[in-house]
């Protein structure tokens, strides 16, 4: 027999400003209601949230649940609803919007670029980027007498400059990085579409993309000349092998997607990770293994995305006795499964030495985040640079006063992180 999921009145897509001492109660409410709960979707109509860890892993691996945005309710549009809607000729090059063999082909193209050994070879360069950014912030703080602000000044710039470096895109300083991200977001490239739903600014302003296009094409043309071993070169070689040929536009689309994926959620997480380190929760004599465990616990405790991106039922599906119609929008509650007391003792506490490493922060199944190794490397490298170069670094406000918020179901982030680096 099949029936309906329990309906939960709380809104999973709104979150008041929070402090570090408080977590949203919605996840506990979902878990108590059942493994599958029904909620109101942002654009209206029903949506379903998976709250149970084992069921979540089943759903994320089930080919009946797909990322195809064509199955989304027709009333949904753009970034307000967390959709990625690439133009048809570019969809085969979009990891987060294709399934099945198309997705497996893209994974084969991208996987060599994220080979752990290849990434480890760039550790010194990644450390140099972190060192430069932190030193510039420390010098500015010394001159002004004000604490450095590490969210806007470091947490987002660091992974952005790293991914651009790895791709061979010559974005070399924070000002260039901010401009590039502003243009990409306005166009809706490489990530969820803009709020206007058509790739333009909702107000009708079309940004000047010529400077950014020049930088992206510079990376693509260098990759075609075989005079570089960047990620873009690897993508080009693999795409040629899979598709026979690949255009400049297609390569540009792939690398813009990696620029977004390589900095936005990572920047959110690094803010939380920095807060935990600067609050003194990492032992002064922590070795590499202890730092890795610390990062793992931060990933469990502070997932930068509280829910997965949308999936849709490709056909009618019954899970745990609940019937989902074709096209049913489905989310997995990442934060809720990460803090399930059935898998973790004191699940809402931050314990770096806890034995269980069970978490869904990077997803599961075929769409498991391909950039996990890079995010982990950036996290460990950042901690190493901070502790070796700025051993006196400390929070400028009490940990308990740090505030964070969410943007719908998509990202959780600290509003600011004032720090005395020296």
From Swiss-Prot:
Pathway: Antibiotic biosynthesis; daunorubicin biosynthesis; Antibiotic biosynthesis; carminomycin biosynthesis
Record carries keyword NADP: yes
pH dependency: Optimum pH is 7.5. This optimal pH, slightly higher than normal physiological conditions, may be necessary to ensure that the proper ionic nature of the zwitterionic anthracycline substrates is maintained for optimal recognition.
Recorded GO CC terms: cytoplasm
Claim: Heme is one of the keywords in the record: yes
Main location, first listed in the record: cytoplasm
Entry EC number(s): 1.14.13.181
Cofactor(s) of this protein: heme
GO MF terms held by the record: heme binding; iron ion binding; oxidoreductase activity, acting on paired donors, with incorporation or reduction of molecular oxygen, NAD(P)H as one donor, and incorporation of one atom of oxygen
Subcellular location: Cytoplasm
Activity as a function of temperature: Optimum temperature is 30 degrees Celsius.
Catalytic reaction list: 13-deoxydaunorubicin + NADPH + O2 + H(+) = 13-dihydrodaunorubicin + NADP(+) + H2O; 13-dihydrodaunorubicin + NADPH + O2 + H(+) = daunorubicin + NADP(+) + 2 H2O; 13-deoxycarminomycin + NADPH + O2 + H(+) = 13-dihydrocarminomycin + NADP(+) + H2O; 13-dihydrocarminomycin + NADPH + O2 + H(+) = carminomycin + NADP(+) + 2 H2O
Xref: InterPro entries: Cyt_P450, Cyt_P450_B, Cyt_P450_CS, Cyt_P450_sf
Keywords: Antibiotic biosynthesis, Cytoplasm, Heme, Iron, Metal-binding, Monooxygenase, NADP, Oxidoreductase
Pfam families: p450
GO biological process: daunorubicin biosynthetic process
Family under the similarity heading: Belongs to the cytochrome P450 family.
UniProt miscellaneous comment: Streptomyces sp. C5 produces significant quantities of doxorubicin only when doxA is strongly overexpressed, but under normal conditions, 14-hydroxylation of daunorubicin cannot favorably compete with baumycin biosynthesis from daunorubicin. S.peucetius subsp. caesius ATCC 27952, a mutant strain derived from S.peucetius ATCC 29050, is the only organism reported to produce doxorubicin in vivo.
Subunit (UniProt): Monomer.
Classification via PANTHER family: CYTOCHROME P450 YJIB-RELATED, P450, PUTATIVE (EUROFUNG)-RELATED
Task of the protein: Involved in the biosynthesis of the anthracyclines carminomycin and daunorubicin (daunomycin) which are aromatic polyketide antibiotics that exhibit high cytotoxicity and are widely applied in the chemotherapy of a variety of cancers.
Protein name (record): Cytochrome P-450 monooxygenase DoxA
